[in-house]
């Protein structure tokens, strides 16, 4: 269908702008129109000319097809979005993340037309809410062990957490937000859980902790708290505390992890890091939570961390391979290899640039490059074929 036969979807202009963290004034200056014009485009009171739409698409780095794409009927999340660092994150960053969540959900829905992702397999738990007060450690340990048992993980270290999470039907993506103060976040969409990781996190132990933290939110909090609840700083702090403790309990089970803690030497904790694939800081926090070590021993460990400048950059961070999301990558490669879709078709129909699709779906760089045919020589038709065509 030609562009002049299609109608621009006003919401898509707003969605694209907000996802890039821009105000209407900022976008208007970049495309040389008034703020009022942008407002009218977004409200559907006026449609941008083809030239202005092309300028908006270029500035916001979306294919023009994005602005013609119908909005799904079920565009709203079915749970609150659980953001880490909500207190210090700017409203622009939170709103940009929300729009990117919606866009990735649509990419996921598009792929589900062609492939079957793993079915969701999460246990149901009864969350023991205690108002503003965080639930106790015993209950957190119980939730973490319930999930381990449900997934058949035993009590030992978890090898590849992203692999396990995706095989059990949780969608995982990485986002290039280019906005500070946001780590990971999670949400339910139509009974499907999504976890989004910040591309700024580049160490495996931190990525694993973020995933475990978000699983805690999806498992414990999604059915009980609304977006309005999360605006309450005390409630948000409570839920973050619970998700942190869940992550520690899930990654480092009380019984088996405790047996490995027989020294307060940082060098011993480095050895444990290699085994458990958890940061030294996380393990110190876990020892404190479980009461494995005394307050003086915890202080001694923290002092060693400070002396060695390990709080920001720990030993083994570079040596440990980073676990990567793969489900959507596998789906796209499968479709491309079997010529079900082309790279150009994927870009056109999802309304996302090749670069952004590669980021969302963790594709190898260049996977969606459209290679031009370099062949300029063709065989002549045979004389028999020429006669037939006459």
Label each PLM-derived region with a short phrase.
Residues 1-390:
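Active-site hotspot residues in diverse enzymes, especially metal/ion-binding acidic/histidine motifs
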């Amino acid at each position: 269908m030609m562009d002049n036969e299609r109608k621009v979807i006003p919401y898509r202009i707003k969605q694209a702008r907000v996802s890039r963290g821009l105000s209407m004034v900022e976008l208007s200056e970049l495309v040389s129109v008034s703020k009022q014009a942008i407002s009218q485009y977004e409200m559907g009171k006026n449609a941008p000319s083809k030239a202005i739409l092309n300028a908006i698409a270029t500035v916001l780095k979306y294919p023009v097809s994005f602005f013609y794409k119908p909005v799904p009927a079920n565009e709203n999340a079915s749970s609150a979005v659980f953001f880490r660092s909500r207190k210090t994150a700017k409203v622009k960053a939170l709103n940009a993340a929300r729009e990117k969540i919606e866009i990735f959900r649509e990419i996921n829905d598009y792929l589900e037309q062609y492939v079957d992702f793993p079915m969701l397999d999460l246990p149901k738990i009864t969350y023991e809410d205690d108002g503003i007060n965080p639930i106790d450690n015993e209950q957190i340990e119980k939730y973490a062990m319930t999930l381990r048992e449900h997934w058949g993980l035993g009590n030992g270290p978890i090898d590849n957490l992203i692999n396990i999470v995706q095989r059990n039907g949780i969608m995982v993506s990485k986002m290039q937000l280019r906005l500070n103060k946001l780590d990971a976040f999670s949400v339910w969409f139509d009974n499907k859980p999504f976890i989004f990781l910040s591309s700024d996190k580049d160490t495996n132990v931190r990525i694993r902790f973020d995933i475990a933290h978000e699983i805690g939110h999806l498992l414990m909090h999604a059915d009980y708290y609304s977006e309005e609840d999360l605006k309450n700083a005390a409630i948000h702090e409570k839920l973050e505390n619970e998700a942190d403790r869940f992550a520690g309990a899930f990654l480092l089970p009380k019984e088996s992890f405790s047996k490995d803690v027989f020294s307060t030497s940082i060098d011993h904790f480095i050895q444990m890091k290699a085994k458990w694939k958890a940061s030294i800081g996380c393990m110190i926090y876990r020892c404190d939570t479980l009461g494995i070590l005394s307050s003086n021993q915890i202080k001694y460990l923290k002092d060693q961390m400070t002396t060695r400048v390990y709080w920001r950059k720990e030993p083994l961070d570079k040596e440990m391979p980073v676990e990567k999301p793969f489900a959507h990558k596998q789906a796209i490669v499968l479709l491309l290899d079997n010529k079900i879709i082309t790279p150009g078709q994927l870009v056109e129909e999802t309304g996302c640039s090749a670069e952004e699709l590669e980021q969302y779906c963790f594709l190898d760089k260049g996977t969606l490059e459209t290679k031009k045919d370099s062949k300029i020589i063709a065989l002549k038709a045979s004389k028999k074929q020429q006669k037939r065509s006459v």
